[in-house]
Each structure stands twice: as C-alpha cells, then as structure tokens.
C-alpha cells in the first residue's frame, strides 16, 4: 500500500488491523491500496479486450456478408437438364408462372422444402426454378449461420433476408437446412440456445414478408422429420417435394447423360445397367460410371465391362457407402 504525508509518498506493507485506516486519517495521512488500483487496471483491460473481440466478430460478420451472400442472375440450369422427376417439374411450373406474374396470383407460397437423400439434385431443382422464373438466385447453407460467437447467427439471418429483399424478385436457397431448422431444445446447452435464436429469427423474417412480395425461400434437407413444427406449418413452408433416388426410367436417362462418350460392352445394355444401379443416388451412379471408365483405361480395355462396374462400385463404396446390385 502507499502512504502520503507531508508531500512524500511511501510504499509500505499493509498492517491490516481493523482501525488502521481510521488512525491514519486522524493523523492527516492519506493512503491508497495498490490492490484496488490493480483490479481497476485489470477490469479496464478486460473491457478493452471484450470490445476488441466484439468489433472483430462484427468485422468478420460484415466480411462474411459481403463474401458469402452472392446473388446470381442466371444459374444456367433448366428443368430440361434434370433427368426424371416429371411430376415435380410439372408442379413447379405453376410456381414459375406465379413468380413471373405475381399480380395474377391470388395466393403464393412463401417457402418450399425439398427433402430426400443426398445426391439426387435438390440444389439443381432450386437453381432450375430460379432460372425458369427469371429471378435472382441467392444460395447459402445452414452451416454458414453457425459459429463460435453467440448472437452472430441470428444477425446473419437478418443480413440474408435484407439482401434478398434488396434483390427481389429473388429465390433464397438454404441447403443443409436441418442444421438450423431442427426442433428447438429449450433445456439444452449454449449451442442449443444459439440455434434456438437462429431459428426464431428465421421464423420472424419469414413472417415479416408477405407472399407475393418477390421473395421465395427454398430449403433442402435430408431429414424432414427433424425440422421444427413451427417451420413447416402453413404460411411458412407450404409445399414439400421429395427428391428421391432415381427410378428405373430416370436411371436410364442418367445413363444416357453420364455414359455419353463412353463405350460399354454388349452385355451391358441400358436396361441391365439401370437395374444394376437400382438403389443408388444420381450422384453415386455418376461416380461409379466415371470410375469405371478410369478402370477401363488403366486395363486398356476397349469397353466398360461388368468387371469394371463391380470394381468401380467397390472403390466408390468406401467413399460413398453405396452397394451395387448384380444380376
């Protein structure tokens, strides 16, 4: 502690008995506690550090906003580029008509959910819907809203919809939607509470714009059952389309696309291959065919054989967890 008397300041040990300060004041001696001063300094440094972290997080959020939320005027994808799923494409034509002529529509949906296993073209459908409608396309994913700083995710949701409103007519596409749209857990950890804030902000933003105002939200998920009931009620996400693994007819169309420029042995007809690929996603079929072509080249074969397909499937199974069905 410091003792000041007659213009002199001395540092002395604190006797620390009950009436010490009173005795010093009676004698006109002022005292100060170094510990208190140190605490003040530490508190000030802590406040400065907290402010610096907050400003850095805000800077990162603004940088993320400018670098992540890009709008695309033309996606270059049409419904004709998508194999199969004719019923979904036909149904989406009515949405295209509504997006092009909002004044003629009595009621438009605010949101559409595309659900189904990965690798079957949910993103492709969203891009085609924007291109066919002639509107801007703004794509993001659920993981973009999650981070280490509490409250930042909700801020990003607000940024997303602000940009969408500025770029309308616009389709907002959110991939991996279940990562932010899961059922809320009010008794969970800090991460759960942050996810609750993100979801609540998303609900508020969707409630904040009216249908027919030029913003349509399309969300893709592999787990529709995990979504919060508040999301999928009428007035928010009104429509749901299942983008499933391709059927026999669609697999034959995919073989025509992915097999272009490749030669198959005479026993591998499109019908046989389509049966062999039963149960695989569109992306898995593409991977197996491309890998089979590489195997054909490595063995200097004239055509892709069933052995190439089996070897390719075995190799891809390690990466994609797929199984080949052989006749």
For the regions a language model picked out, list residue spans one by one.
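Phosphoinositide-dependent membrane-docking surfaces
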Residues: 1
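Extended, hydrophilic extramembrane loops/domains of integral membrane proteins
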Residues: 4-35
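Intrinsically disordered, low-complexity N-terminal extensions of AAA+/P-loop NTPases
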Residues: 9, 325-327
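Interdomain "pre-motor" coupling segment immediately N-terminal to P-loop NTPase/helicase cores
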Residues: 34-71
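Hydrophobic alpha-helical transmembrane segments in multi-pass membrane proteins
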Residues: 51-56, 167, 171-175, 287
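Proline-centered turn/helix-capping motifs that create local helix->coil transitions or kinks
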Residues: 62, 263-264, 321
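Walker A/P-loop NTP-binding motif of AAA+ ATPase domains
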Residues: 66-275, 280, 292
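AAA+ ATPase "lid" subdomain C-terminal helix
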Residues: 275-307, 314-322
């Amino acid at each position: 502690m410091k003792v000041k008397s007659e213009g002199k300041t001395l540092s002395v040990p604190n006797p620390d008995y009950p009436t010490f300060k009173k005795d010093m004041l009676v004698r006109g001696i002022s005292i100060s506690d170094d510990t208190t001063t140190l605490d003040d300094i530490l508190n000030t440094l802590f406040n400065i550090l907290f402010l610096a972290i907050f400003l850095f997080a805000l800077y990162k959020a603004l940088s993320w906003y400018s670098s992540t939320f890009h709008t695309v005027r033309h996606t270059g994808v049409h419904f004709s580029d998508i194999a199969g799923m004719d019923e979904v494409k036909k149904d989406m034509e009515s949405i295209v008509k509504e997006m092009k002529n909002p004044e003629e529509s009595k009621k438009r949906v605010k949101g559409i959910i595309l659900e189904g296993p990965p690798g079957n073209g949910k993103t492709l459908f969203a891009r085609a819907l924007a291109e066919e409608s002639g509107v801007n396309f703004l794509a993001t994913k659920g993981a973009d809203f999650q981070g280490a700083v509490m409250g930042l995710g909700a801020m990003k949701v607000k940024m997303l919809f602000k940009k969408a409103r500025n770029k309308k007519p616009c389709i907002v596409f959110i991939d991996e939607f279940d990562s932010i749209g899961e059922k809320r857990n009010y008794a969970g950890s800090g991460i759960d509470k942050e996810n609750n804030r993100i979801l609540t902000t998303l609900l508020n933003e969707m409630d904040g714009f009216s249908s027919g105002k030029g913003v349509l939200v399309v969300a893709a998920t592999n787990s529709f059952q995990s979504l919060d009931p508040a999301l999928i009620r009428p007035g928010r996400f009104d429509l749901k389309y299942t983008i499933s693994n391709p059927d026999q007819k669609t697999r034959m169309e995919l073989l025509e696309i992915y097999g272009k420029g490749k030669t198959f042995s005479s026993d591998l007809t499109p019908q046989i291959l389509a049966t062999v690929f039963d149960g695989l996603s569109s992306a898995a079929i593409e991977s197996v065919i491309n890998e089979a072509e590489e195997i054909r080249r490595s063995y200097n074969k004239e055509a892709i054989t069933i052995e190439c397909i089996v070897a390719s499937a075995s190799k891809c199974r390690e990466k994609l967890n797929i199984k080949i069905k052989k006749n």
